[in-house]
Amino acid sequence: MSDAHGVARDQLRAFIERIERLEEEKKTIADDIKDVYGEAKGMGFDTKILKKVVALRKKDEQERMEEEAILDTYLLALGMIESPPEG
């Protein structure tokens, strides 16, 4: 029975160590992304808009169109636009 516990302990340790390595890689990547946004900002780009563009590019066209239609409906209801844009 003690061998089974030892194996489980070793497996658990291996999982934890893998997760820790991946978390460190994730932090490094997040720092790299932050640096890229900083470079873009330094060249005059609006990073808030860049982040929106990145988020939009992750979505498929149909999903984007549905979200835009809902947004237009809400803006129209709030009087923030006169009529939904054609398109």
UniProtKB/Swiss-Prot annotation:
InterPro entries on file? GapR-like, GapR-like_DNA-bd
| UniProt cross-references to NCBIfam families, sorted A to Z | PRK13694.1
Q: Name one Pfam family in it.
A: GapR_DNA-bd
Family classification:
Belongs to the UPF0335 family.
Q: Which organism is it from?
A: Rhizobium johnstonii (strain DSM 114642 / LMG 32736 / 3841)
* HAMAP family xref list: UPF0335
Q: What is this protein called?
A: UPF0335 protein RL4065
> Which molecular function term from Gene Ontology is one that the record holds?
DNA binding
